[in-house]
């Protein structure tokens, strides 16, 4: 904890600036030697020359944060140099030569945690904000970083501590009967607390599934336009398009964002009877992808009459029993597909879309509207979020213990035992872990300079 550490806080690569962070008792002294300047007012920005052994390295913006008013709670210095990775490495090496050591992954955040600048829920939120790929969850993470999850947990903890104190008082006067109004009040209190915890847990589990991305399989007979549809949605030539049947022999997967939701597009091999062994394997993978997907795009060629392969596809869609968008492709050509017959054979709820892939942007817009209609409408503006398995496990244990406490209301010793166990589980959400090994494991997932 007393070491002075340094690291490059920005991604390696060329850009406008790179940031080098220094934290520890020697941070200010190192900055003075780097800049050959002695006076720094905390929280003021200075433009300074940066030297190493008397050799000029760069002109940079530097800021000194005096302990405890910094991210880590220690003296912190930031050097914002020009964004050349070689230059940033040279300045970092100069810091190391002056007595700093290279920071471990997540060590700045670990210092902030150990110095009580952030709790576990805020630490979790900070790393998830960096990793998050879902725009709709950013607000919930920002609110968690602000400390709203901590406030929620601490309020619940305070409520349970009051119940525990009341129970302990009654235990001390065990010769008297437990007041019935006390039991009713405590039971109602616990029910509300359990419900609020379950709401948080259910929302977090739903969000976790959503973060994996909605799997969308594109299926159809050969040459129906599946690969063209994929390319249109990606606005690039990702899949090979050919008039030769069986061109796509394996599944192709790409990730896009539609209206703040991550979508995994899976282009599949054309479904038909084939004597080609490799193509048959591709078709088997196509059918397998339908079992694991969330939404199906069933592609039909509007310019051709329905044939056996189309009816096989309809049977496949009916068996899959998944949300389905029936895409009638190639509507720029004269329509020959018997639409009413197609509709009569579909036995599942579906949405219908006529389009063509020649106009990629229009096609993408039409599909986005249809696909997004299947997305769950989640209110993340007013929701808190659990971001790790450890947090979810702790809350699940708290719920379990509260339910046990409620079941043992008339046996105060057991009630108090389960209530205390629930409080201890809540502590794991915001309060320090007990072993340094667990801390090291948690912060090792962070990046350098964080």
UniProtKB/Swiss-Prot annotation:
One of its GO terms (cellular component) is cytosol. InterPro entries: G_TrmE, GTP-bd, GTP-bd_TrmE_N, GTPase_MnmE, MnmE_dom2, MnmE_helical, P-loop_NTPase, Small_GTP-bd. Exhibits a very high intrinsic GTPase hydrolysis rate. Involved in the addition of a carboxymethylaminomethyl (cmnm) group at the wobble position (U34) of certain tRNAs, forming tRNA-cmnm(5)s(2)U34. Mg(2+) binds at residues 227, 248. One of its GO terms (biological process) is tRNA wobble uridine modification. The keyword Kinase does not apply. The gene is mnmE. Residues 213-376 form the TrmE-type G domain. (6S)-5-formyl-5,6,7,8-tetrahydrofolate binds at residues 21, 78, 117, 450. Its cofactor is K(+). Keywords: Cytoplasm, GTP-binding, Hydrolase, Magnesium, Metal-binding, Nucleotide-binding, Potassium, tRNA processing. Disulfide bonds: none annotated. Its main location: cytoplasm. Binds 1 potassium ion per subunit. Homodimer. Heterotetramer of two MnmE and two MnmG subunits. PROSITE patterns: G_TRME. This is tRNA modification GTPase MnmE. It is found in: Cytoplasm. It comes from Helicobacter pylori (strain Shi470). GTP binds at residues 223-228, 242-248, 267-270. One of its GO terms (molecular function) is GTPase activity. Its EC number is 3.6.-.-. K(+) binds at residues 223, 242, 244, 247. Belongs to the TRAFAC class TrmE-Era-EngA-EngB-Septin-like GTPase superfamily. TrmE GTPase family.
